[in-house]
């Protein structure tokens, strides 16, 4: 409910220009992301330090940065995820700040897509993130708040891919798609297997050569990317959490390729250093096990045990001590 109110502040700022409402939205976002968000950018959980009738339900924000004891089976309400994405989109459209694009991308792949079953289309009310946990889907005849929020979220998956101003187009998400920029009479087609594959291709369509800037988002999780224009490698500085600017006169059929550098990484809970999440590139990985996952060694030793199960399946292996775990992207888990 609170996030919906703050989204109302955003609409009021856009309608009236009242600065206090813009500040309210930005301050709320900072509090949410820096003190209450899980590794995939979403939030909400129980309040185990409080004893009330509703304290153990998964629709609270508790003490700031106290998250490790909230990983019950029901956390990360889908309404919270959807409405946080609306905040991310508003703040980016006002500022162009890459930090909002970073959170939007993280949530898109690791909080939004995982709430829907790939086989049935059903949605979860809460997205479990602890260990061991499984997804519990709503029934076809359920009519909960998240039933509507999820339907809206999946009807608007294309909303955050592209932005533009008078002279530039911004690519915030890497999703196979086409966009037509009416003011410049420019078409842009995007292709590739991102996020499973690190290569994305673009093709420009114009009636006559036109000048504009193509801004490609470089997420915080990558330590490098290589860009080619019409097959020629571009010698450009690439910084995480920024936009790589390609400014030129574009002709019909011009091609751009970006190749991201993927790596495994571990992210800790803010209040418990040894409670970890495993990522590969942009993807949050889930363990394929019914048991509590307890790992041995320090972070470097755990990272050294991670590898691909094979090059095509999108599955991963973690060899840790005498045990071997299988992992896959959270959005690919159906149960």
Language-model segment annotations:
Residues 30-34, 113:
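Amphipathic alpha-helical segments of tetratricopeptide repeats
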Residues 1-14, 72-92, 150-157, 198-200:
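Well-ordered alpha-helical segments within folded domains of soluble proteins
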Residues 1-4, 42-77, 120-143:
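Carbohydrate-binding/catalytic loop surfaces
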Residues 223, 252-253:
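Short, flexible surface segments
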Residues 25, 98-200, 205, 239, ...:
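C-terminal beta-rich recognition modules with glycine/proline-rich loops and embedded aromatic residues
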Residues 222-247, 266-271:
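Solvent-exposed beta-strand/loop surfaces of large extracellular or lumenal domains
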């Amino acid at each position: 409910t609170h996030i919906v109110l703050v989204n109302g502040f955003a609409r009021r700022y856009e309608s009236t220009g009242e600065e206090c409402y813009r500040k309210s939205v930005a301050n709320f976002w900072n509090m949410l992301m820096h003190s209450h968000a899980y590794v995939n950018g979403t939030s909400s959980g129980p309040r185990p330090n409080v004893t009330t009738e509703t304290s153990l339900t998964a629709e609270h924000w508790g003490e700031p940065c106290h998250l490790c004891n909230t990983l019950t089976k029901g956390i990360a309400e889908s309404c919270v995820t959807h409405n946080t994405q609306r905040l991310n989109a508003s703040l980016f459209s006002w500022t162009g700040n890459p930090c909002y694009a970073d959170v939007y991308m993280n949530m898109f792949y690791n909080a939004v897509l995982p709430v829907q079953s790939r086989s049935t289309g059903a949605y979860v009310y809460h997205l479990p993130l602890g260990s061991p946990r499984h997804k519990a889907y709503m029934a076809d005849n359920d009519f909960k708040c998240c039933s509507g929020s999820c339907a809206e979220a999946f009807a608007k998956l294309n909303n955050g891919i592209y932005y533009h101003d008078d002279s530039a187009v911004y690519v915030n998400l890497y999703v196979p798609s086409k966009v037509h920029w009416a003011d410049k009479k420019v078409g842009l087609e995007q292709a590739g297997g991102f996020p499973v594959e690190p290569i994305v291709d673009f093709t420009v369509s114009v009636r006559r050569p036109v000048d504009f800037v193509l801004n490609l988002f470089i997420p915080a999780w990558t330590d490098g990317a290589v860009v080619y224009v019409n097959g020629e490698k571009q010698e450009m500085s690439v910084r995480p959490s920024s936009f790589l600017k390609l400014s030129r006169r574009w002709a019909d059929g011009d091609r751009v390729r970006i190749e991201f550098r993927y790596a495994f990484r571990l992210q800790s809970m803010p209040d418990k250093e040894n409670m970890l999440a495993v990522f590969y590139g942009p993807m949050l990985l889930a363990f394929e096990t019914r048991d509590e996952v307890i790992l041995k060694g320090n972070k470097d030793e755990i990272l050294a045990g991670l590898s691909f199960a094979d090059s095509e399946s999108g599955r991963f292996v973690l060899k840790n001590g005498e045990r071997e775990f299988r992992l896959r992207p959270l959005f690919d888990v159906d149960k």
